[in-house]
Amino acid sequence: MTFRLKAGQLAENERYIVLDAVKHFHRLKYWITAAVVMPDHVHLLLQPVVTESGVDFSLSKILQGIKGFSAREINRGRKAKGHVWQDESYDRIVRDYAEFLEKWNYIRHNPTKDELCEAPEDYAFLWEPGEAPE
């Protein structure tokens, strides 16, 4: 899943806000394999959780929560109002392990590709919890 900033770039403290929003419902509403918050966009490799009662969390609801919370906090810090994120987002169903590895590696190496760090593990806004969904 990818979503983009409406305009400009996120300051470092704003990227922490977004990453915290992503982490907040990990294991409760979705399982994150990898998340990266870039200056102007976010990539997530996640799987929605299905509860014991059969309730699953839709991608649109998951995204609404992440974007809504982070936008409110970013606007509060900027003393601004209005949209932080573009309305559009892009998602894709990962159909096999090869595609999973491709997406995971793309997310991991996005900061190095954009020359924000030398190695993926050096980028403060890359999160890979290292857990598998139950």
Identify the residue ranges that each predicted region occupies.
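Short catalytic/metal-binding and nucleic-acid-binding patches
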Residues: 1-134
